[in-house]
From Swiss-Prot:
GO molecular function, one term: DNA binding
Protein name: DNA-directed RNA polymerase subunit Rpo3
Gene encoding the protein: rpo3
Gene3D superfamilies, per database record: 3.30.70.3110, DNA-directed RNA polymerase, insert domain (2.170.120.12), RNA polymerase, RBP11-like subunit (3.30.1360.10)
Highest taxon listed in the record's lineage: Archaea
UniProt keyword list: Cytoplasm, DNA-directed RNA polymerase, Nucleotidyltransferase, Transcription, Transferase
Catalytic activity as recorded in UniProt: RNA(n) + a ribonucleoside 5'-triphosphate = RNA(n+1) + diphosphate
Family: Belongs to the archaeal Rpo3/eukaryotic RPB3 RNA polymerase subunit family.
Enzyme's top EC category: transferase
SS bond list: none
Length: 262
């Protein structure tokens, strides 16, 4: 049974030591977090007026990359949005942007007006474009649920892991020699496996580096669309669903093969 010990935690970041899990499971979780988590992102932009120096296409591209808060608990499951089971209006949020410059102004992400107060830019101070006197931007933008496997603008978080290193210092002079790389050679949370290997190159046989089998340091960092706890819960839900679909398909295949033999 895998054991998890959380060693660092904030609303948007989590680092944990995972022990007793196969690499395939840990890597599957990492891949789901990176490419499968559903988030809102602007996907369609209707430009009514744009007299700024920025092309409409570049303006739309910038809007798409603005991270938006995504209240999963009040949105349909991403699978229903993708399959058409959910009402399209429930999977889409409309934004408007209207700025008329009386002088030199910077248009920020906070100037976007959402029809839903719970789906708004994560950060209000992301610059979009600068306007000078007489210039204006008027547009409508539509955000929808999506996954990062379709486009990077739908990426909700980063995740990675490394094998838990086992370091044996055979000469104390090696600690000082490696201080710039690792302040504490024997602390696996500070001195990653790659850093330990770099120190081994500096110290030679005065430092022995190995790793714990089926033990890892795993970390997740959210971009702010939702907190890291929500990201992990959703990742496990998606992973569990994938396993269920696979087992169902395997059972049907086995049943068909058995009937064919009869």
């Amino acid at each position: 049974m895998p054991a998890v010990k959380v060693v660092e935690r904030t609303p948007l970041f989590l680092k944990a030591v995972v022990e007793g899990a196969y690499p395939s499971l840990v890597n599957s979780l990492r891949r789901v977090i990176i490419s499968e988590l559903p988030v809102m992102a602007i996907d369609t932009v209707i430009v009514v007026n744009n007299t700024s120096v920025m092309y409409d296409e570049m303006l739309a591209h910038r809007l798409g990359l603005i991270p938006l808060t995504t209240p999963l608990q009040s949105l349909p499951p991403i699978e229903d949005c993708e399959s058409g089971l959910a009402d399209p209006s429930e999977c889409t949020v409309r934004f408007t942007l209207q700025v008329n410059a009386d002088g030199e102004v910077t248009v920020y992400s906070g100037d976007l007006v959402s029809e839903r107060p719970d789906v708004v830019p994560v950060h209000k101070d992301i610059p979009i474009v600068k306007l000078v006197k007489g210039q204006s931007i008027v547009l409508e933008a539509y955000a929808k649920l999506g996954r990062a496997r379709g486009h990077a603008k739908w990426q909700a978080a980063l995740a990675s892991y490394y094998y838990y290193p086992r370091v044996e210092v055979r000469d104390e002079s090696c600690r000082e020699r490696c201080r710039e790389v690792c302040r504490d050679l024997t602390n696996p949370l500070e001195c990653t496996f790659n850093k330990a290997m770099t120190c081994r190159d500096l110290c030679g046989d005065k430092l022995h580096v190995d790793w714990e089998r089926n033990k890892y340091v795993f970390w997740v960092e959210s971009f702010g669309n939702y907190d890291v706890d929500t990201a992990l819960r959703e990742a496990f839900r998606i992973l569990k669903r994938k396993y269920s679909l696979f087992l169902d398909a395997l059972a049907r295949k086995s049943s068909s093969a058995a009937e064919a033999k009869l």
